[in-house]
A protein has these predicted regions:
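Short, small-residue-biased leader/transition segments that mark boundaries at the very start
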Residues: 3-8
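Iron-sulfur-associated redox domains of electron-transfer enzymes in respiratory
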Residues: 66-355
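Residue-level recognition of alpha-helix initiation/capping sites
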Residues: 19, 40, 50, 103-104, ...
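Charged, flexible boundary elements
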Residues: 27, 31-34, 47, 120-127
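Short beta-strand "wing" residues that participate in macromolecule-binding interfaces
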Residues: 35-36, 66
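Short linker/helix segments within small regulatory modules
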Residues: 37-43
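Local cysteine-cluster metal-coordination motifs and their immediate loop/turn environment
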Residues: 9-30, 47-61, 147, 194-202, ...
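Non-ligating segments of multi-cofactor redox enzymes
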Residues: 1-2, 15-18, 144-145, 153
């Protein structure tokens, strides 16, 4: 800041101890942003950028923005003819539980449906499926890195390409539940709503784009609420789906590893057959440390849970709230689940398939 710079100037008139680092450069743990010496403008190195959105959140001037699909989503809903021409589903990230201080997740879900969606589905249900499949894959391959966070996946592919073969082959929770919706309701359209800017890139992946039409953020969701005059605080509570506690806590760091551990237990995998030893990386700096250890053959753990955002998805750049209560809110959301296990959630999922 200028005040701090003035202090340094008084202490050292030669500016020998003054170092100005722009917020975007400081925020980019992937080291993808640099200052052009001639123009003095910040430049993003696309070969290093992982689309985590940290620079977007930290820039005080709004000089860096993500590409919005809000108008396309509105058109998609309008052209559905009240979901008679085709149905539009909203898949909502479990970090929805931490977006508002005194508003229940069920009220937010009701507000989203009031935007014109045919139904609102928990991405956490997809997380249950991913935890189950990832546990099976891990027990077979003996080492994996998670695939749920697209920014973490990008970081491996760009920074540690030799480790890319260890990335889980499973779809993300968003894509997993969207695929189920497409199979259940042929011709439907799916919109993901969450805290993540990197998801906007993920929906363009070859294996994802056939399931998810658009990804918008919680900030864009709130803009749609405001535009349509929806006061979520006054909404009646909508009925939530059948995601388990373990699927819902994917939203915070450590939740994915806990879910995989539970899935291994429910699958009857004993410690003798395979003992899970996970490292949960809280932010890109910790991801880098774990990947460097793996690269050098020094990593003792057999599963890397990578979260590009500190805190996990609850620390995403497009969250409406960033405070100490967020983890507790997500944990409470998990405890409110009607399903006590991942297998119960998957059974409910299979029962829903038969309808």
């Amino acid at each position: 800041s200028r005040g701090l710079g003035d202090v340094y100037k008084r202490q050292c008139p030669y500016s020998a101890i003054v170092k100005h680092v722009r917020p975007c450069v400081r925020a980019c743990k992937a080291e993808a942003i640099y200052i052009d010496k001639e123009t003095e403008k910040a430049v993003i190195n696309k070969d290093k950028c992982i689309s985590c959105g940290s620079c977007v959140y930290q820039c005080p001037f709004g000089a860096i923005t993500d590409k919005s699909s809000i108008t396309q989503v509105i058109s998609l809903i309008r052209n559905s003819g009240n979901n008679k021409n085709y149905r539009v589903y909203a898949v909502v990230a479990p970090s929805v539980a931490s977006q508002y201080t005194d508003i229940a997740p069920e009220q937010v879900m009701a507000g989203i449906k009031a935007l014109g969606f045919y139904d609102v589905v928990e991405a956490a249900w997809g997380a249950d499926m991913v935890a189950w499949l990832e546990a099976e894959e891990l027990a077979e391959k003996r080492f994996l890195t998670s695939s749920c966070c697209p920014a973490f996946v990008n970081y491996i592919k760009k920074g540690f390409p030799e480790l890319a073969e260890n990335i889980s082959h499973n779809l993300s929770p968003m894509a997993q539940i969207a695929r189920w919706l497409q199979e259940k309701d042929e011709g439907c359209h799916v919109v993901f709503i969450g805290p993540c800017i990197a998801k906007k890139g993920e929906v363009k992946y070859t294996k994802t784009k056939k399931y998810v039409d658009y990804a918008i953020t919680f900030e864009e969701m709130q803009a749609m609420f405001s535009a349509k005059g929806i006061d979520v605080a006054s909404m009646d509570k909508a009925q939530l789906g059948n995601a388990s506690c373990f699927g819902r806590i994917f939203a915070r760091c450590g939740g994915l590893a806990e879910a995989v551990k539970e899935a291994l237990k429910e699958q009857g995998v004993t410690e003798e057959q395979f003992g899970l030893s996970a490292v949960s990386c809280n932010g890109i700096s910790e991801c880098k440390a774990a990947l460097l250890k793996k690269q050098k053959g020094l990593l003792k753990e057999n599963f890397i849970e990578g979260m590009a955002c500190e805190g996990g998805c609850i620390g995403g750049p497009a969250c409406l709230s960033h405070n100490a209560r967020n983890t507790a809110q997500v944990n409470a959301y998990g405890r409110s689940s009607a399903e006590s296990s991942i297998s119960d959630a998957i059974k409910a999922f299979r029962d829903e398939e038969k309808k």
